[in-house]
Structures are given as structure tokens and as C-alpha cells.
């Protein structure tokens, strides 16, 4: 099944961007490469239950199995040993990426209380965008009764654009609600 946002990209966004930036080749048009969802869990080293519930929640939200990230070296001030679980990461590409982006834009972000839009200043110098969400309850897959602990996540949308302006316009065309 072709995702709605992928179809929107091919039929309307690509021609708009080609006209606006005067691209000669369709392959010059920026696109979304991947979406990385990350959740750091500082308390995971003490409790396996928090790690397991976080892993299951992220898998449910993303629709794909994630990877448990582990510490690379020991840091005494954080009471952290080497190779201890410190978070969960899911990388989405292709159809699942477009499906997640669609759910995030149309279902999750509007459910945030007092939502004014997302900050347009969170782009890196290559046109990729990162945002942090404070809780997982905004996603329709989450049920309040089944959540052990409310914790946020970081979402990075990696694009092929080379400039911030290109990335911003690309994500605006997809429907990401940026603040004015």
C-alpha cells in the first residue's frame, strides 16, 4: 500500500520544489532519507522493567522493532559502567517512515496541550530537523492505563537537502506545523 505522504511528495512536492529552486534534475530535489526515534533512559541501568516498557512503547509507536543502545565507556560521575543499556533507538525508512510521519503530523502533534507549532530553528546546517517530545501519550497507539512511566523521545528527520531553507520548505510542504 502506497503511503499518502509518499504520493503527496511525488505528485505535488517534487514539482513545487523543482520550480522554486530551479532544479534541472528530479534527483536534486531534497527528500526525507530516514526518521530516527531515540529515547534515552538514564534509570535503565538500575531497573530492567523501565527499559523493557520503553522498548515495547517505542516499538508500538514506530511500528518496527528498535535497538537497545548501550554505553560505550564507563563514566564514574554518572555511575555508569561500560556496555550498560542507556536507551532505545528506532530508525525508520521507506513506507514505515512515511506512515509514522503522517501519524505524527495529523494525529500526535495536534494532541499536545497548548500546541503552538514546532520551532523552525531546530535544523542542523545540512537541513535535517530534530524535535523533542515530552510524553508518549500523544500517539494514538499509547493507552494511558498501560504506561508505567511518562517519558519523552527525540525525533530526527534526516533529509538530503544541503541548505536549511530547502529542508524547511520540504518539511512545510509535508505539513509539519512550524511556528511563524
UniProtKB/Swiss-Prot annotation:
One of its GO terms (biological process) is translation. Part of the 50S ribosomal subunit; contacts the 5S rRNA. Binds 5S rRNA, forms part of the central protuberance of the 50S subunit. Belongs to the universal ribosomal protein uL5 family. NCBIfam families: PRK00010.1 (NF000585). GO terms for cellular component: chloroplast; ribonucleoprotein complex; ribosome. Keywords: Chloroplast, Plastid, Ribonucleoprotein, Ribosomal protein, RNA-binding, rRNA-binding. It comes from Oedogonium cardiacum (Filamentous green alga). InterPro entries: Ribosomal_uL5 (IPR002132), Ribosomal_uL5_bac-type (IPR020930), Ribosomal_uL5_C (IPR031309), Ribosomal_uL5_CS (IPR020929), Ribosomal_uL5_dom_sf (IPR022803), Ribosomal_uL5_N (IPR031310). It is found in: Plastid, Chloroplast. The keyword Ribosomal protein applies. GO terms for molecular function: rRNA binding; structural constituent of ribosome. This is Large ribosomal subunit protein uL5c. Gene3D superfamilies: 3.30.1440.10.
Amino acid at each position: 500500500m502506497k503511503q499518502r505522504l509518499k504520493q503527496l511528495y511525488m505528485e505535488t512536492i517534487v514539482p513545487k520544489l523543482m520550480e522554486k529552486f530551479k532544479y534541472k534534475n528530479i534527483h536534486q530535489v531534497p527528500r526525507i532519507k530516514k526518521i530516527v526515534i531515540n529515547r534515552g533512559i538514564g534509570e535503565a541501568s538500575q531497573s530492567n522493567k523501565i527499559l523493557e516498557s520503553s522498548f515495547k512503547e517505542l516499538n508500538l509507536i514506530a511500528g518496527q522493532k528498535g535497538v537497545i543502545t548501550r554505553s560505550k565507556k564507563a563514566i564514574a560521575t554518572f555511575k555508569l559502567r561500560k556496555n550498560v543499556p542507556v536507551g532505545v533507538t528506532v530508525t525508520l525508512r521507506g513506507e514505515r517512515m512515511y506512515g509514522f510521519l503522517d501519524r505524527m503530523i495529523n494525529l500526535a502533534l495536534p494532541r499536545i496541550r497548548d500546541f503552538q507549532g514546532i520551532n523552525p530553528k531546530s535544523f542542523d546546517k545540512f537541513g535535517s530537523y530534530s524535535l523533542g517530545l515530552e510524553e508518549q501519550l500523544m500517539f494514538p497507539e499509547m493507552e494511558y492505563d498501560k504506561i508505567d512511566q511518562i517519558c519523552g523521545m527525540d525525533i530526527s528527520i534526516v533529509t538530503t537537502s544541503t541548505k536549511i531553507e530547502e529542508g524547511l520548505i520540504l518539511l512545510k510542504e509535508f505539513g509539519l506545523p512550524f511556528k511563524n
